[in-house]
Amino acid sequence: MSANGQRRSHYAPRVLHIVPALFGPNDGIFGGAERYALELARHMSVETPTTLVSFGERERLETLGQLKIHVIGNPWHVCNQRTNPVALSLFSELRKADVVHCHQQHVLTSSLAALVGKLSGRRVFVSDLGGGGWDVSGYVSTDRWYRGHLHISEYSRKVFGQDDMPWAHVILGGVDMEKFAPDETVLRDGTVLFVGRLLPHKGVNDLVNAIPSNMPLELIGQPHEERFLEDLRVLAKGKRISFRHDCDDVALVQAYRKALCVVLPSVYKTMYGDVSKVPELLGQTLLEGMACATPCICTDVASMPEIVENGVTGFVVPASDSAALGEKLRWLREYPHEARRMGQAARERVLGKFTWPSVVQRCPEIYSA
C-alpha cells in the first residue's frame, strides 16, 4: 500500500507525532531515529489524519503526501541542548490531537506532552529512539505519565525494564519497500558499506581495522566527534576507505544496491572505554540494506540480532572482534552466489516482518486499547 494518494473512507483519530530532535534536510540530523518517525507518520497519514511536529531554525509548514509537517522555528533549547527544544506553539498542536505519539521519552517536550495528556484526557504514547537531555524524568519516573510505551525492538523493552509490563508493546520498525529495493541493472562493485553517524559506540574503528587492504569501504554519515573522525582517518591510512558525510536518499539507495554488504559493528564499550547500554535500539540501516537485497553483518549487540539471521540473511559476529568481522567480509567476497542468496533472504525477511504498513497496523490497535 502506498503512503501517497489513497483516500480515507472511515472516521479515524487525529494523531500527532512529536520529534524533539531537529528535523529536515537543512535543520536536521542524519540518522535512523529521524527517518523512523517520519516514515511511520507518513504511512500512518494514509489511514488517519496525521501531523508531525518537530523543531528547527525557522518556522515551516509542509505536506508530504497526506502528512502535515510543522517545523516549529526558533525554539528554546533546554540547558542549551540542541536536541532538547521546547516552544509554546507546541501546545496549540496538542489541542488539535486525539492521540499523541512522542518519539523520545527523556526530553522536556515529551514530558510536557504527557502531562497535558493526563490533565486533558488525551492518549499520549512514547517510543524511545535513543538520546535525550535534561528532563524531569531524571528526578521522578515519568513512565506512567504515558498511556503506553511503544518499543521498536524486544531489546528496547527489556533494557528499559518493561518486558513484563502490560502497557509496554513492541511495534518494531519498517522500511519503504518501494524506495529501498534491489535493481537488477545495478552491478555489485564489492564495496563494504557503513551508514550512520560516525560516533564511537558505532564501532566503526573495528570495521576499519577489519577491512582487508584491497577491499573498498565507504563510510556514509555525519561525524559528531572530531577526535573520533581523526582517529578513523589515521586507522584508514593505506586502505581503500572513503568518507561521505552528505548523502541524499537517491544516492543512499544506489550505495546499498551496489554494496557487497552493509555492516553495523556497534559496541557496548567504545575504543575510549566509554560504555553504552543502548548502542542500538533497532538498526534502521540494516533494514534498509536488507530491503535492497544486500546481506548484512552486525555485532551481537543490543537489538541487531533480532534483525539479522546469522548465516541466513548475513552474519552476527562478536563485538570488537575485528578478526571475526574480517573473516566474514572475505567469505562474502569469495562466495558471491551464496552472498546473493543471503541478500534475497534478507529482503524476504524485511517483507515478512519489517514493513511500515505492518507497523502502522500495530499502532492503532494499541492507541485504542
Give the residues covered by each predicted segment:
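A short, well-ordered alpha-helix in the C-terminal region of glycosyltransferases
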Residues: A324, W331, E338-K353, R362-E365
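Conserved acidic donor-binding segment of nucleotide-sugar-dependent glycosyltransferases
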Residues: N310-G311, F315-S322, W331-P336
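A conserved mid-protein helix/loop that constitutes part of the nucleotide-sugar donor-binding site
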Residues: R35, G190, R197-P212, R227-E230
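Acidic donor-binding loop of glycosyltransferase active sites
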Residues: R257-P279, T294
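Nucleotide-activated donor-binding/catalytic signature segment of Leloir-type glycosyltransferases, i.e.
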Residues: G221, L229-Q254, C261
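Donor nucleotide-sugar binding/catalytic pocket of nucleotide-sugar-dependent glycosyltransferases
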Residues: G132-G133, R144-A181, Q284
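Short hydrophobic beta-strand element within catalytic cores of glycosyltransferases
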Residues: L264, L286, P295-C298, V308
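Short acidic/histidine- and often glycine-rich active-site loop of Leloir-type glycosyltransferases
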Residues: Y272-G273, D300-G311, F315-V316
